[in-house]
Regions:
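NAD(P)H-binding glycine-rich loop region in Rossmannoid oxidoreductase-like domains
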Residues: 125-164, 197-198
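Conserved glycine-rich Rossmann-like NAD(P)H-binding loop of the short-chain dehydrogenase/reductase
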Residues: 96-109
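NAD(P)-dependent short-chain dehydrogenase/reductase
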Residues: 202-283, 297-311
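Mid/C-terminal beta-alpha module of Rossmann-like enzyme folds, strongest
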Residues: 280-375
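Conserved Rossmann-fold NAD(P)-dependent oxidoreductase catalytic core, especially the SDR/UDP-sugar
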Residues: 157-160, 164, 168-208, 225-226
């Protein structure tokens, strides 16, 4: 069966660039039907592969949360977005005094309320004065920061917009939290992509940079900062919506490649995570929360075949390759193989050593690994001054690189040894048809952090 898979995949790769040719199109159709038949035999297309994900719920200790929120003013940035609006509609169920939404989108498709406690301020988090005035006027007690530019592909072609929104906009929010004496906690929505040890993809880099900003202010400021790491959000999934629409209206459905898997969660889980952070934030430490039980990842090709089968249209699937923002290869050393039964894509090995689990065993709590205040402050200063698309990406990535180097100097060296062993042993590289250089700058950075130590002797043979 595996050989048959590979033969079909290989042929689809060969034919995909020629999809406009009638003969190639017809053969792609036949190959797609063959794949659907194979997946059907395995019982993989009988229902939406994400059905169980949509139905999942997390524990939410409402009495304890209400004790925290009672009589408070909550400010939600991006409160007219998918997660933000759902959060607002959940907050009204608690005994809060007022909910302020700060959002630039005057034409949102999401609805909030109606509820007399909700007030909307239209403004952009990139505008420091708007942020300052909003905080000064409403004096929030709790800030939920969900506003962001969230499209990884868009981020690669709109670098300044993404960096100024995600990084400098977050900096505006954090600074406003510090100078507004009423603020007790600030909760930030991050991404599982920030668990990467290092990344050169713009969207993921901005979120990882932000996590370090919150870690910095948790140590220097007076406010408690917490975070959630979201994975693929089904309720506003760019991938899922594109596959569905193309299956209904286009003459083919494109997927990046076979063997590309995504973990996912729903907006109810997302909001429950953010509310749970209220109970797990600590002074001096930026904790993050993730869903513990994410289930097995779903293949994007499987989703495409499911939608084609569902529409009963005679159209093929094609492989389009990985676009910008989705090109980095998954590194096996990202996950903690000391306990294979507890693997989770949203937390890396260093962070996993600090993990705790809530009483209901459905949420993992950990914290980011600090780099050092001066390193982060220097990276922020450079990013605040830079202009231009190319220059902004260079400063973003170089700043993040220095932050990561600082982190590698502080972490347990044996953990770095374990990471390199789990990720770079030849038997694992052979399975992935990969080499160490495929994983980018993080590999030489890790080796460099071990040089001159006894730990280096344990891994030097892995350098190839």
């Amino acid at each position: 069966m595996e050989t048959k898979y590979n033969e079909i995949h290989k042929r689809i790769w060969e034919l995909s660039p020629r999809i406009k040719c009638p003969e190639a199109y017809e053969e792609l159709n036949l190959l797609t039907k063959e794949l659907i038949h194979i997946y059907d035999l395995q019982g993989r297309l009988t229902e939406d592969p994400f059905n169980s994900t949509r139905a999942r719920k997390l524990s939410q200790p409402n009495e304890r949360i209400n004790d925290v929120l009672k009589g408070s003013t909550c400010l939600v940035t991006g409160g007219l977005g998918c997660v933000g609006s759902h959060l607002v509609n959940e907050l009204v169920k608690f005994d809060v005094f007022r909910i302020i939404i700060l959002d630039k989108n005057k034409n949102s498709s999401y609805t909030v309320g109606p509820d007399p406690s909700i007030e909307i301020v239209y403004g952009d988090i990139r505008d420091a004065q708007v942020v300052h005035d909003t905080f000064t006027k409403y004096k929030p007690d709790f800030v939920f920061h969900t506003a962001a530019q969230r499209d990884p592909g868009y981020a690669e072609t709109h670098i300044v917009e993404t960096v100024t929104t995600n990084v400098l906009g977050t900096l505006n929010i954090v600074k406003a939290c510090e100078y507004t004496g009423s603020v007790k906690q600030c909760i930030f929505s991050s991404t599982g992509k920030a668990s990467r040890y290092f990344t050169e993809e713009v969207y993921a880099a901005t979120k990882k940079f932000c996590e370090n900003i919150l870690d910095l202010y948790s140590k220097l400021g007076r406010v408690k900062y917490g975070m959630v790491r979201f994975t693929h959000m089904l309720d506003n999934s760019l991938m899922n919506e594109q596959l569905r629409i193309h299956s209904e209206f286009e003459n083919h459905v494109g997927v990046h490649s076979p063997g590309k898997y995504v973990t996912a969660q729903n907006k109810n889980e997302a909001v429950s995570l953010m509310l749970n952070v209220l109970l797990y934030s600590e002074v001096g430490q930026a904790n993050f929360l993730i869903v513990k039980n994410l289930e097995w990842p779903v293949e994007s090709l499987e989703m495409a075949l499911y939608y084609i089968k569902k529409t009963r249209r005679n159209i093929p699937v094609v492989f389009i390759g990985n676009p910008l923002g989705y090109t980095e290869k998954f590194f096996r050393g990202q996950m903690d193989w000391s306990n294979p039964c507890e693997l989770n894509l949203l937390i890396n090995v260093y962070e996993n050593k600090f993990r705790k689990v809530n009483d209901d065993d459905d949420v993992v709590v950990s914290h980011v690994c600090s780099s050092g205040n001066k390193v982060v402050e220097k990276a922020i200063c450079k990013l605040e001054r830079v202009k231009g698309e190319v220059e902004t990406k260079i400063v973003l990535i170089n700043g993040l690189k220095e932050i990561v180097k600082g982190t590698l100097e502080k972490v347990n060296k044996q953990h770095t040894v374990d990471i390199l062993n789990w990720g770079l042993q030849q038997k694992f590289l052979d399975v992935e048809n990969a080499k160490a250089s495929d994983y980018g700058a993080i590999i030489p950075m890790m080796f460099g952090s071990l040089e001159g130590s006894a730990h280096y002797e344990q891994v030097k043979n892995l350098k190839g």
